[in-house]
Amino acid sequence: MASQKKVIVVESKSLFDKMLEDAGPNRHILVEFFATWCGPCAMIGPRLEQLAVEYNNRMIVMKIDVDENEELALQYEINSMPTFLIIKNRVTLVQFVGSNVSKVVSTVEKYVGKPDEVKDAKGKAAEGSGPQTVAKL
């Protein structure tokens, strides 16, 4: 089970729309627009898997292949890969380009918080990733 992938590969606009709806108003979504032929996209993949685990209860991590989902690529005006978005409550908070792992991590921390800042519903530090966690704003 430890090898199970946490990053969701979005294969259609309808699945993307459903994921936005399912995330609700409090959960962030990190989206990577990528291409299978994009070397830097492949290089950052393992770190995205780590982020998906570290932020399991607060952020959904998904990947969208621009060649398979042209409508979404056009909707978000994707011109370079990888392009990342952080979305919350259907609103794009930030969009940036590049495979710099440090930039991706620091941007996630800026908008979502650090993984160790997970709090339970009573405001106490949670033990790992319990089911009653909320993002520190």
Residue ranges of each PLM-predicted region?
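Thiol-based oxidoreductase modules, predominantly thioredoxin-like and allied folds used
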Residues: 10-12, 33, 44-71, 78-81
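Hydrophobic heptad-repeat coiled-coil signature
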Residues: 38-41
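Non-globular targeting/processing and membrane-anchoring segments
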Residues: 112-137
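Conserved beta-strand elements of beta-rich interaction domains across eukaryotes
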Residues: 15, 35-36, 68, 89-91, ...
